Swiss-Prot record:
Protein name: Uncharacterized protein L671
Organism of provenance: Acanthamoeba polyphaga mimivirus
Top-level taxon: Viruses
Length: 152
């Protein structure tokens, strides 16, 4: 599907690239998503765009930072979202706690698709549904609270 960059009017194809023109899609005031890289926020006092497509050649004219909308429910650190609008899938922080294990998801650099079992009972401070970062999962394994499944 062809679209035009809102700023320079060059044609961009919704996909990874076309003729060297990469793109980003705005998903809110000054928040945009770059395919396969994640969500970012423009650092300025005025709204550049709220919706639409802008090529990366144009977006390079602005200062922007990774948008960190994902937090670890144990250490409370914030992580760069990899899925637009996500609060649970971030770079190095994407998992879900179940009653007897933690399941790693897309975004985790170490535990994507892995099952990490609690050795005995799930600790009280780790709630079902929590999102736990790779670093905290490492600590849970290193302290003997969890172990990776033999199927991983």
């Amino acid at each position: 599907m062809d679209k035009k960059c809102q700023l320079c009017q060059s044609n961009v194809e919704i996909g990874l690239e076309t003729n060297g023109k990469f793109w980003c899609k705005f998903i809110g005031p000054n928040k945009f998503f770059i395919c396969l890289e994640g969500e970012f926020e423009i650092l300025c006092d005025y709204i550049v765009a709220q919706t639409g497509i802008i090529c990366l050649d144009c977006i390079k004219n602005y200062d922007y930072v990774p948008y960190k909308s994902v937090s670890c429910d144990l250490c409370l650190k914030n992580f760069h979202s990899i899925v637009p609008g996500s609060t649970c899938q971030g770079h190095r922080c994407s998992s879900e706690v179940f009653s007897d294990h933690i399941e790693g998801y897309y975004g985790s650099y170490k535990y994507d698709k892995d099952i990490i079992n609690f050795v005995s009972k799930r600790p009280n401070n780790i709630k079902i549904g929590h999102n736990i970062c790779d670093g905290c999962i490492d600590n849970l394994i290193n302290t003997g609270i969890c172990q990776t499944s033999s199927n991983n």
